[in-house]
Swiss-Prot record:
Reactions catalysed: N-acetyl-L-glutamate + ATP = N-acetyl-L-glutamyl 5-phosphate + ADP
Task performed by this protein: Catalyzes the ATP-dependent phosphorylation of N-acetyl-L-glutamate.
Lineage: Bacteria, Pseudomonadati, Pseudomonadota, Gammaproteobacteria, Alteromonadales
Top-level EC class: transferase
Site feature: Transition state stabilizer: 14, 222
Compartments, as annotated in UniProt: Cytoplasm
Positions contributing to substrate binding: 49-50, 71, 163
Protein name per its UniProtKB record: Acetylglutamate kinase
Origin superkingdom: Bacteria
Pathway assigned to this chain's UniProt record: Amino-acid biosynthesis; L-arginine biosynthesis; N(2)-acetyl-L-ornithine from L-glutamate: step 2/4
Length: 263
């Protein structure tokens, strides 16, 4: 099943990479979203904020490490990361939305139980695994014409703040709402060993490229999250770049841009 992009099917747009620190690109993105909203009113943004975290930790002379594409988050750092995601990154996006006339609401994964977050067992510190939650709050906000902007910070049942990978968070929000998903990043989509765009990807092909080391690190996390969403939602997921603003509306409307991931 392909992306439907209708007035009734929500679209979750995951934002990442250097986009969050590029004011011109953000303005172009929200301009495209304004046009898109005329044909599809139910839109949700999900974001991380790794670029802001890297800058903040560097200024504090704190080294940041990753394991298999996921940020290791010591408990002593979770306050800084929460501030970067929920504070800086979220409010930068809200500011652009307000500037372009959107009625925005900034959220975390904990608000209204929109997702269920548990402590990861992968030895990453204060990092959470994210699953679908209660759609009530998001459904009410979308019905009221609001644009939810969700940062990938969660809280588990014990009240612990947890850093959640934004690709995984976006997948969980899609499952909560039975929504379409587009992941925007710095690259055109999934690339092969020759750095050429792969137009279509499925789980078998992904496993081959992961085993060969072609897909690794952050892209491996992204592809696995997209495959999970494609399987659970029974629809295609798109991975594409934010760097071609003139094609963003076409992408959001389901036209052939970037890489299409199917189960």
């Amino acid at each position: 099943m392909t992306m439907k992009a209708t007035m009734t099917t929500p679209l979750v747009l995951k934002l990442g990479g250097a986009l969050l620190q590029n004011e011109t690109a953000l303005e172009q993105l929200f301009t495209a979203l304004s046009e898109y909203k005329s044909t599809c009113t139910s839109l949700i943004l999900v974001h991380g904020g790794g670029c802001f975290v890297d800058d903040l930790l560097a200024k504090m002379n704190i080294e940041s490490e990753k394991k298999n594409g996921l940020r290791i988050t010591p408990a002593s750092d979770i306050g800084y990361i929460t501030g970067a995601y929920v504070g800086t990154a979220n409010k930068v996006l809200m500011a652009q939305g307000i500037k372009l006339g959107f009625n925005v609401v900034g959220l975390t994964l904990a608000d209204g139980g929109i997702s269920t977050v548990t402590l990861s067992t992968a030895g990453l510190g204060a990092v959470g695994e994210c699953e679908a939650g209660d759609p009530t709050l998001l459904t009410a906000l979308l019905s009221g014409g609001f644009l939810p902007i969700i940062s990938s910070i969660g809280i588990d049942a014990q009240g612990l703040l947890l850093n959640v990978n934004a690709d995984q968070a976006a997948t969980a929000i899609c499952e909560t709402l039975d929504a379409d998903l587009v992941m925007l990043s710095d690259v055109a989509g999934i690339l092969d060993a020759d750095m050429q765009l792969i137009a279509e990807m499925n789980s078998h092909y992904a496993d081959e490229l992961i085993m060969a080391g072609v897909i690794h690190g952050g892209m491996e996390v992204k592809v696995k999250a997209a495959l999970k969403a494609a399987a659970s939602l029974n629809r295609d997921i798109k991975l594409a770049s934010w760097k071609v603003p003139e094609r963003l509306v076409a992408l959001l409307n389901g036209e052939a841009e970037g890489s299409k991931v199917s189960s």
